[in-house]
């Protein structure tokens, strides 16, 4: 079993093993974000060009997601080489990953919406809107007065409901986010959406990795990604060329690093 420190050291070096592959991936990243580049350069585009760029960005989004999945697969298979870009195959894999992501996030979303209803959040909002609506006809009443006129118990009910809903939402999205990472590994390994949606096997894989080890890995990944993101932010601040470097090298580097770290971690469950 690879130590977490060694795992992340190797993952940080991984993107530099093939600069050509990194730059090719970077070009895809750059083209997918051309609208952001033009915005940063304060270049105004007409609606037709913006629509075309949006379509290209959407297509390349799935390509990049699928490519990241291929990096995870190669890492699970203990392959140290950065995989070649296959636009069609990567696009299809990106669509598969989207299906998995929707399933894993729609479950906590439904639960959170249900909790919002049970906690009285929606009814509190309706009570406040209805109460404030009574003063709408009075044009002499300003917004501040309308808000202050609402009984405190209405605001208390809203605050309590929102607090409960937010706490449940944070917990659920963290849990399902952790499950999704392993589901992504199963999709990469078996190339079947059904395997990624097999919650029993996903939980079993996490147990094989070790719950504590997995949580520590996730925290370290977040910390390192934040540090890299801050560095990337400083680079982006460089006029004109900064944003090119960010999309051509920085963002692809972080993506390859994260996917390599994930695939290597999952290989411990093999």
PLM feature spans:
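Functionally constrained cores in energy, signaling, and assembly domains
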Residues: 33-35, 39-46, 84, 90-93, ...
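Selective recognition of hydrophobic, aromatic-rich stretches within alpha-helical transmembrane segments
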Residues: 45-76, 155-196, 232-270
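Alpha-helical polar/charged "hotspots" used for coordination or helix-helix interfaces
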Residues: 74-78, 203-204
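Interfacial aromatic "cap" segments that immediately flank transmembrane helices
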Residues: 2-32, 85-110, 159, 178-230, ...
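A cross-kingdom feature marking solvent-exposed beta-strand/loop segments within repeated
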Residues: 77-85
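Juxtamembrane/interface motifs at transmembrane-helix termini
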Residues: 43-45, 113-114, 122, 224-225, ...
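Short, small/hydrophobic-residue-rich motifs at membrane-helix boundaries and re-entrant hairpins
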Residues: 20-41, 49-76, 96-174
């Amino acid at each position: 079993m690879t130590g977490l420190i060694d795992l992340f050291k190797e993952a940080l070096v991984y993107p530099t093993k093939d600069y050509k592959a990194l730059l090719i991936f970077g070009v895809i990243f750059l083209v997918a974000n051309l609208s952001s580049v033009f915005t940063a350069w304060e270049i105004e585009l007409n609606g037709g060009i913006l629509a075309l760029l949006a379509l290209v960005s959407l297509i390349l989004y799935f390509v990049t997601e699928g490519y990241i999945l291929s990096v995870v697969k190669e890492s699970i298979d203990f392959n140290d080489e950065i995989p070649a870009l296959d636009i069609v195959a990567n696009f299809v894999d990106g669509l598969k990953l989207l299906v998995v992501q929707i399933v894993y996030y729609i479950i906590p979303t439904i639960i959170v919406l249900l909790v919002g209803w049970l906690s009285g959040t929606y009814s509190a909002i309706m009570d406040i809107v209805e109460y404030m609506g009574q003063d709408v006809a009075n044009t002499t009443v300003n917004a501040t007065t309308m808000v202050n006129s609402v009984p405190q118990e209405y605001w208390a009910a809203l605050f309590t409901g929102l607090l409960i809903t937010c706490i449940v939402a944070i917990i659920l999205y963290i849990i399902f986010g952790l499950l999704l990472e392993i589901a992504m590994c199963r999709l990469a390994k078996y190339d079947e959406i059904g395997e990624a949606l097999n919650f029993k096997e996903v939980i079993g894989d996490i147990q094989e990795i070790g719950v504590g080890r997995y949580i520590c890995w996730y925290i370290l990944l977040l910390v390192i990604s934040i540090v890299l993101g801050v560095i990337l932010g400083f680079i982006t601040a460089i006029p004109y060329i900064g944003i090119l470097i960010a999309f051509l090298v920085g963002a692809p580097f972080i993506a390859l690093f994260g996917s390599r770290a994930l695939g290597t971690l999952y290989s411990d469950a093999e």
